[in-house]
């Protein structure tokens, strides 16, 4: 009898403590779930789009702003035999992140028709890639390509757009722009110097006169990349900028919506140049600055 009583007491002790432990674990789980819920709510605060990806807005983050010469040095090193990227790979990574950011910020139902102005250099190539991805996302895309690049890489990008039924036109007028909900400026990137020349000066003026929302790729076309002056007399007045690799000195004081896209700088380059890169979250290819 005494042995049976002792066994019963032991079982009750285990049961009571198990219940307490279970209650404690439930409390912890509830607390953590609540915290996660808050984080998710903050991540999705603002506009909802047809995209499923999220972005965390980080405040007071450390980020390196690149001079024109350092940006060129890093770009060359990324495509060196030592690192091993190709131009095509970098364009695909950049173009996809551009498309994802646009998809996040400009909902499909309000900004379905997009006109993308592409320049003759790699910035324009990023725009051509973004056009293809945006088409796949369901947007109605037109590319304006006033000065076509005849290199094989760019011809392949144009051929892909043809197979995705994306119209590519040589020019667009102010009246043409009125038909679109959003304009993307992929004319000039970080290698641009001097003042925009014809036909790009007219295009920039036309974009600014359109009163349409404008997104710039890497930098607003026409600005001084090093930011040591107010910029050129004529530059794109965009409402959002998508920096690539790292932001450039010319957009250090950019006070409108600003993203960093691409996520392709390897650790060795970060360490070599002591770069400060904002923390990307999860599988996101971009972060809001």
Curated annotation (Swiss-Prot):
Read off the Pfam families from this record.
YjeF_N
**InterPro entries xref list:** YjeF_N_dom, YjeF_N_dom_sf, YJEFN_prot_NAXE-like
YjeF N-terminal domain span: 71-277
- Record keyword Nucleotide-binding present: yes
Binding site residues for K(+): 123, 185, 221
Molecular function (GO) terms for this protein are: metal ion binding; NAD(P)HX epimerase activity; nucleotide binding
Cofactor descriptive note: Binds 1 potassium ion per subunit.
Show which residues constitute the signal peptide.
none
Domain of life where this protein originates: Eukaryota
Would you name any one GO CC term? Answer: mitochondrion
Principal EC category: isomerase
Name its co-factor(s): K(+)
This enzyme catalyses: (6R)-NADHX = (6S)-NADHX; (6R)-NADPHX = (6S)-NADPHX
Q: Which UniProt keywords apply?
A: Isomerase, Metal-binding, NAD, NADP, Nucleotide-binding, Potassium
PROSITE patterns reported in the protein's UniProt record: YJEF_N (PS51385)
What biological function has been recorded for the protein in this entry? Catalyzes the epimerization of the S- and R-forms of NAD(P)HX, a damaged form of NAD(P)H that is a result of enzymatic or heat-dependent hydration. This is a prerequisite for the S-specific NAD(P)H-hydrate dehydratase to allow the repair of both epimers of NAD(P)HX.
Entry's PANTHER family? NAD(P)H-HYDRATE EPIMERASE (PTHR13232:SF10)
- Specify the protein name: NAD(P)H-hydrate epimerase
Q: Which organism is it from?
A: Plasmodium knowlesi (strain H)
> From which lineage does this chain's organism come?
Eukaryota, Sar, Alveolata, Apicomplexa, Aconoidasida
């Amino acid at each position: 009898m005494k042995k049976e009583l002792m066994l019963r007491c032991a079982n009750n002790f285990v049961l009571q403590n198990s219940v307490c432990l279970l209650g404690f674990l439930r409390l912890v789980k509830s607390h953590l779930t609540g915290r996660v819920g808050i984080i998710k709510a903050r991540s999705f605060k603002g506009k909802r789009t047809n995209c499923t990806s999220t972005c965390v807005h980080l405040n007071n983050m450390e980020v390196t702003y690149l001079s024109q010469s350092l940006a060129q040095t890093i770009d060359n090193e990324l495509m060196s035999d030592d690192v091993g990227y190709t131009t095509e790979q970098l364009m695909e990574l950049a173009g996809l992140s551009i498309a994802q950011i646009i998809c996040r910020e400009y909902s499909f139902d309000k900004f379905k028709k997009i006109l993308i102005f592409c320049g003759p250099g790699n910035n324009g190539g990023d725009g051509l890639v973004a056009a293809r991805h945006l088409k796949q996302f369901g947007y109605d895309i037109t590319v304006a390509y006033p000065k076509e690049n005849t290199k094989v890489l760019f011809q392949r990008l144009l051929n892909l757009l043809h197979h995705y039924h994306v119209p590519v036109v040589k020019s667009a007028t102010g009246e043409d722009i009125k038909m679109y909900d959003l304009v993307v400026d992929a004319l000039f990137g970080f290698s641009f110097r001097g003042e925009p020349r014809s036909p790009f000066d007219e295009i920039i003026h036309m974009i600014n006169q359109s009163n349409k929302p404008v997104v710039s790729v890497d930098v607003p076309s026409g600005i001084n990349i090093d930011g040591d002056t107010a910029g050129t007399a004529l530059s794109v007045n965009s409402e959002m900028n998508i920096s690539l690799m790292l932001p450039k000195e010319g957009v250090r004081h950019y006070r409108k919506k600003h993203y960093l896209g691409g996520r392709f700088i390897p650790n060795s380059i970060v360490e070599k140049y002591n770069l400060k890169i904002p923390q990307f979250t999860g599988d996101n290819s971009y972060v809001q600055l």
